[in-house]
Amino acid sequence: MNGVMEAAADIRPKSGDGSSYLDAAFGIGARLLRSAVWHGNICNWFGPVFEEHAGSHQLACGTLGPGLYDGTAGIALFLGYLGRELADPAFKRVAHAAIGHALARAKDIPEGIKYGFYTGEVGIGYAAIEVGRCLEDPTLVTRGFELVRTAAEADLDGNAVIDVMSGSAGVIPVLLRLFADSGEGWLMDAARRRGDILLARASRDERGLSWDVLGELAGTMDLSRLSERLADIKAGDRSRPNLIGFSHGAGGIAWALLELGAASSEARMQDAARDAFAYEDSWFDAANDRWPDLRLHDAGNDVTSPGPIAWCHGAVGIGLARMRAWRITADERYRGDAVAALRMTARSLLNGSPASANYSLCHGLAGDAELFLTWAELTGDAEARALVDTVAARGIQDVVREHRPWPSGIDGAPESPGLMLGLAGTGYFYLRAARPVRIPSVLLVGPESKPRPAGTAYG
């Protein structure tokens, strides 16, 4: 790893320029303010959306939904933090209007993903709580907690999605974070119920513990809405192995179970987390130094696709989960996995084409940089922080100074307003790069952790 870092010396800024990062966040925030569409005291944005046409989902332009991932709740979260950090009433006003839209339209979310974090009501409620705190608006905080409680205590019956993106695995750590803040017992009770759902839906084989996330999702929604290459997956289809990775795979679910086990002292949750991490470990390709993309894998065939580097699928999300696992357990195996993820991601960053890469949190440079920012917070590692500054400086040089649109995480859409795929997420990255202690990660939302002693190196 050190050799890779030395090769980056010629493109690495000498130090993080916090003022320019705030300027970049301000510029993105100002663009969102100018493009907001108002209706009374709430607002929305036009952006890329997928609409059904002739039996398939095609990219179109339309108003955004209410969710955290790609809707008004996510934009509100960014603008709320930005308004607080800059003490700017204009950003605060639009943050309030955006979260007002999200709260009003939460009822429109499809049933299959309604109770999740990134796509559902728990995420909207969480954003309302955070925006309310930024704006010192106790009414918003109360409304946020009420929505989280409604979603957390809903009767999921047979419609429980299980992954981090839309299901119980994403909700559990958020409930635990809110429990740590408030001490409200219903939050822990709801987290335990969600944990029981995860254990009940798990599959065990010689590799470890895993979940048929795509099959579960196919039973609740048309997967072509996520990707055309997933359109042929049906509920109960066992022709593909269960996924690894963070947003839809075993690693993200393992992280949720580990957080629950640590908070509740339930050994069965901790044991299940260990077995789920073991499943993910079993797929690691040591010869090629990668985790494969099992979305592209059919049973009986070799995995030949390059290993992905992203939060949603790949080394970034896997690394974030292992960093947190190391923090909770002090197990050096998890540290080793985190180092592997750092190595792969650094290699991708330094060998890639930053001018054409997108700056999304989900599967872009902003998300890649979060892996190094989290590691720097955890260990005090200066090299990791330097890579964050490299990514940030590239964006300022290639996009801001060249007056280009920020590349989004949606193919065919040069710019998008949302949090995980677009402008709000890019702005969030710059705000967090400038104020990492004050701005929490939105890619690993769970109970707070304390940094390890400064100077802990990797590689």
Residue ranges and their predicted role:
Residues 1-459:
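Glycan-recognition and catalytic cores of secretory/periplasmic carbohydrate-active enzymes
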